[in-house]
Amino acid sequence: MNRLPIRFEQVEGGIILLAASALYFILGNNPWLFFLLFFTPDLSFAGYLVNPRVGAVAYNLVHTLSLPLILIALGLTSQSLLFLGSFGLIWVAHIGLDRMVGYGLKYPDGFTHTTMGWIGKDKGKN
């Protein structure tokens, strides 16, 4: 299996993580809030308690850039909505970390089957 596209995605994830984090802190946002909310998107794992399909949909919904970019755009529209942009940056940074370490979007057959290959106990299936 040619892993070069996956490596590119991992490097891109690292750049996204660094850029979103840097922008968050350059804008003078609260560091404690960043660390407190950084793993909030992983609450979507709770969907796996229902079944793998629901888990994959929940995980994928909060691990794509669409929703956090909407929050960032809303945060740019008004001073009173600035906190939404800050949360969006934290969310984007989290997604970047996941991609950097090889966690892609999930397939409905199980948590370990991702768009970037198999992870965890199933990693050898690549």
Labelled PLM ranges:
Residues 1-126:
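N-terminal membrane-targeting hydrophobic helices
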